[in-house]
């Protein structure tokens, strides 16, 4: 376990973005701790990062854990400094005890043995159910460490299915649920596979160029130039590909990403079936989405929202001029404002 301290100045940044809400963050010294925790499966450890205001007691209703999507780890997006501060920094500076976790196969977490073999040598690995198990290990670690019974849970993209599945089975451990770009049943059928296509392997290889093209796919041409702050894509890509020790063995460098999520998408979301039942979620839930999300279009978030039939309350926010990765774009403070508006509000009496 490693711990370090970071002095960040957030007053001006937050004052300009949150002045309308009358909020102003003071300078905060954040304590950062990196830990490897057991997954509960032999030989598999999970990377967990924690940030919170140094020297401040933990508030039981201000603890949040974030889980990533299908291709990239949590650390290099949620904790990527943009203009000096990351989304994780911003939330922690508001007095939150913030965690991120990488499920097995991603970031600094253990890569299953199949990832050291050619992808075609094994079937897809790390299903959504396995990833939800890993999220559960992180939640239990945090509950034990902070001696609380519930925490806030946030997932992005595939992480919404990880977090949603987990919450549907463990409502008693979740205070609030945030789903950023949720997966749901697709209208369009999957692209037909070629007759000679190879079976889906254990993992796939992803290049930086393909990541950039995917990021900007549905952004109008005249809006692309200033969508991503200068240097952010390069900083994110360099940090992300550096998490894979085998990326440099390819030219160009290639990031390994597990294919369990792809198999689940083919067998469920693209086959007209739900992977789990959102109707089993019984905690306050926020859905965040951006209008130019090419990976998971708006109708998916709307369809998912309709299935949240047993939450005490629910909210769907559509952000303008943003993509699947709005959290790292020019309108990231819109994202932050809506997120904190949900997390900061007091519980209804019925939930106390």
Enumerate the language-model features and the residues they cover.
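Conserved hydrolase catalytic core segment
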Residues: 146-188
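Catalytic histidine-centered segment of alpha/beta-hydrolase-like enzymes
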Residues: 322-333
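Short, surface-exposed "cap/lid" segments of acyl-processing enzymes
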Residues: 55-100
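N-terminal cap/lid segment of alpha/beta-hydrolase-fold proteins
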Residues: 26-58
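Conserved alpha/beta-hydrolase "acid-adjacent" motif
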Residues: 294-300
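Alpha/beta-hydrolase active-site loop
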Residues: 119-145
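Glycine-rich "HGGG/HGxG" loop immediately N-terminal to the catalytic nucleophile
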Residues: 74-75, 101-123, 324-325
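Alpha/beta-hydrolase
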Residues: 188-286
